[in-house]
Amino acid sequence: MQAVYILSAVRTPIGKFGGSLASLTAADMGVIAAKAAIERSGVRPDQVDETIFGNARQAGGGPNVARQVSVRSGVPQEVPAFTVNKACASGMKAIALAYQAIALGDAVCVLAGGTESMSRVPYLLDQARWGYRLGNQELVDGMYRDGFFCPLAKMVMGETAEVLAGEYKITRDEQDEFALTSQKRAARAIAAGRFEAEIAPVTIEGKKGTAVFNRDEHPFPDASIEKLAKLPPVFSNSGTITAGNSSGITDGAAAVVVASEHFVKQNNLKPLARIVAITSAGVDPRTMGIGPVPALQKLEDKHNLRLHDFGLIELNEAFAAQLLACDRVLNFNRDRLNVNGGAIALGHPIGCTGTRITVTLLHEMLKRNTRRGVATLCVSGGMGMALALENVV
C-alpha cells in the first residue's frame, strides 16, 4: 500500500453563533475552504477524483452539501461527491474515506473536509405536512433534535459530561481552570498570529458594505477564573457543566487535499504530512466523551503508536469534564495537548471540527518541526476517532 499525503490544510475563521458567518450556508463556507485548499495544494481542480465533506446539521442546507461545494469550487461536474454525517467526527471521517480510497487505488487525489452552519439550523414543525387540526403543537429546535439530544442515551450532551464528571470525580474548579487555560492559550495564539497560515479569510457582504473576516471570534480573551466561577450549571442545579467550561456553538469550514505518493511524485508536489493511521471506536452513549481513549488505544494496539510518540495532541474540547476524564485514563503531557487552545475557546462547528483540529494540528507541527502528531475527538452517540500524522516537510 502506497503512502497517502496531505498537500494542503485550510480552514475559515470560526464564527460565533449568530456572528460574522451566520449569513453563509454550510456550502458557502465549504466552498471558501475548498477553493483555498485546492489553490494551496498545487493541484488543478480537474485532477481531483472525488470530493468528500462532513456535515452534521443537514436540515435546510440543500441536498448533498459536498456536491455543492465540489462544483462551486471549480471541480468538474464529472467528478463525484458525497456528504458524510458521523456527528462530531464527520470532518475527520471525510479525511479517513479519502485516505481509504487512495490506499485502495480507487482514487489518487481527493478533496476532503467538513463544514457547519450552526447559526442556520432551522426549527421544525413535525406534523405540519399533514395539517394541524385541534390542540397545541410544539415548535422543535433542530439544534436540539438533531444534535444536543442523544436518542440512545436519552440525554443531552451536557448530561453525558456530568456523568463523566461524577464517575471520574472531576470538580467544577478543575473544569473552570482547564477552560481558562484554553481561553488564554487561544488568545496568545491569535495575538501571535499562529493561526494565520491555516486561515482562509472570508469576504462578507453586508448592509454597511464589504468586510473581511479573518480571525476566530468565539474566544473570550478577558476570561478569568472569577468570571467562570459565576456561571450557573446548565444541566442540573448541583451540576458542574457550564457555558464557560463547554465548547462553543459556532460556524466554520475546513478542507484538505489528499493524494497518493505516486501522484505527488508524478506532479512534483510538496506534501505537508503523511497520514500514518486512523482509528475509530465505540463506547457507551451515556459516556460518549470518553471515546478518544479507546480510539487512541487502538493506535497502539493496531499500529504500535503510543501517546509518547506524538509531540503534539489535538483533543477536541467538547466539555472540559470530557477531556479531563480522558486525561484521568491516559495522563496526557499537558505541554503537548491543545497548545493553542481548543473548542472551549475556539468553538465546535460540529461537521467541521474533525477536519479543523487536523488542520490546526498539522500547521503547529510544521511550526515546531514536530515529527508526529495526533488529532482525536469524542462523538455523540458514543464513539471516538483519532488520526495520526507524520511531518514530511
Residue ranges and their predicted role:
Residues 159-162, 195-198, 206, 276-345:
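Active-site pocket-lining segment
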Residues 85-116, 159, 165-194, 255-262, ...:
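Active-site-proximal alpha-helical scaffold in enzymes
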Residues 59-64, 211, 215, 285-292, ...:
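Short glycine/threonine-rich loop-to-helix capping motif typified by GTGT followed
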Residues 1-24, 36, 225-290, 294, ...:
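Condensing-enzyme catalytic core mediating Claisen C-C bond formation in acyl metabolism
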Residues 81-90, 245-249, 275, 288, ...:
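Active-site nucleophile and cofactor-binding loops and adjacent substrate-binding regions
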Residues 109-163, 167:
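Flexible glycine-/small-residue-enriched beta->alpha junction loops
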Residues 1-61, 65-73, 77-80, 160-172, ...:
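Conserved active-site "lid/cap" helical segment
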Residues 11-12, 22-24, 29-32, 40, ...:
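N-terminal extracellular/periplasmic Venus flytrap/periplasmic-binding protein-like
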